[in-house]
Amino acid sequence: MDHDLDKFPLLSYVLHQHDSNLHAPPSMAAQETLLPSFPLLSNPEIMSMLTQSIPTTITQTLFVFNSLGSRPDPLAVSSARFKIAQIMDSLSPEEAAKESEIYAGVVRLDEVHDSYEKKLKDTEEELSRVYSTEVESMLRSGEEVNEKVLAVLKEAESGGTVERIDLSSQELKLIPEAFWKVVGLVYLNLSGNDLTFIPDAISKLKKLEELDVSSNSLESLPDSIGMLLNLRILNVNANNLTALPESIAHCRSLVELDASYNNLTSLPTNIGYGLQNLERLSIQLNKLRYFPGSISEMYNLKYLDAHMNEIHGIPNSIGRLTKLEVLNLSSNFNNLMGVPDTITDLTNLRELDLSNNQIQAIPDSFYRLRKLEKLNLDQNPLEIPSQEVATQGAEVVREFMRKRWGDIMAEQQQRIGVEAERHGDENGWVYWGTSMVTNLVSGVTHTIGFGGATSDGGDKKPGDSYFYHQI
């Protein structure tokens, strides 16, 4: 039985058609996604070309792949790498080699799995390319003609200058190979089709500035997308993406990225280090649980929409996004229980939506958001400020928090005076200094980590860290 070939449905299908005794058919689920994407597989000429394209070594590759057994859990591999690093740091090379042998075995097994999966993936992509080429041939001969697609292909092949291609809502199952010859392409719109993948060959479009593949059935983006160094606008919303490739961080010219309406569970770790020119980031309606720390490096970000996710906490470093004007963190429901004090460093913020969460208090330093015009705190168990105050808009909330801040300062000053009298003037100031150092350390402790509960599970007093930082 072939090893997990549902990851490579086209290869599995062609192998079964070639030798049904040796190779099992794809699962029903795989066939349901495969056949709509490759509707002409029943064509004898196409199937013949696909069969001839399969490497002669595929049987040996599958045999070895089957003999490997299950791939190690990613967490186990990560732990093994960590253990090896620890051992290498603490022992001599000879001792380390022996001590780390069992962990090295886990890593090697994972690497072998990765190597063989890459071979199968390459074969899958080659079959897809062959299929595309054969369909194009049919287009040229007048079969299955889509006039708009054919016109684009003819212009591209004639050597004409083509900078913009709009093939939105054309029921495309694949992207014709000839597209990758249009090296001067600046704008490509393939939205509203039935595409399930983007070939690696997209990297040939070096001048591409805007790519719209929204409203398709994409489950992944190719790593080669990171080679589109002139790309300024990327729209991949309304697909089936579970992750964005790490290589997207190389698209340093990106100004707008829309990855909303997908199934993303995380963002690439280094995304912020590369996308420092990004101004708009739309990641709403996904399954994100946290922001990577590097998001604070997106210094030019003006618009961030992350509503309808599963976000548990906001990194304190969000305060570094000082150009941010619109921030929507609404509808993270039971997951988001607080925001860090540093959110008040976003002094250019005009719109803030924190509705439909579990926030009990906003930072006491909230009055610093002087440019805030729109504020939505609905559907939160608010205590500070009260629901009555919160519903009256940004200006009222800002004034309420300004007064509260003044009261806190006055109370602190009065407490210092009382302590000074109680301990004597000199000793009182010593007490005050000790108290302030202790509180400052406490504030820093609260500041490290994410907005919401403290590391020991207790609730943080809103505004404390900012208060002591200011003093």
Swiss-Prot record:
Organ and tissue specificity = Widely expressed but preferentially in roots.
Q: Which Gene3D superfamilies match?
A: Ribonuclease Inhibitor
Report any one BP term from Gene Ontology: microgametogenesis
Kindly give the SMART domains that the UniProt entry links to this protein.
LRR_BAC, LRR_SD22, LRR_TYP
Here the disulfide bonds are: none
Q: Where are the LRR repeats?
A: 159-182, 183-205, 206-229, 231-251, 253-275, 276-298, 300-321, 324-346, 347-369, 371-392
Superkingdom of the organism of origin: Eukaryota
Which keywords accompany this UniProt record? Coiled coil, Leucine-rich repeat, Repeat
User: Which protein family is named in the record?
Assistant: Belongs to the SHOC2 family.
**What role does it play?**
Leucine-rich repeat protein that likely mediates protein interactions, possibly in the context of signal transduction.
Q: What is this protein called?
A: Plant intracellular Ras-group-related LRR protein 2
Q: Can you name the source organism?
A: Arabidopsis thaliana
| Gene it is expressed from | PIRL2
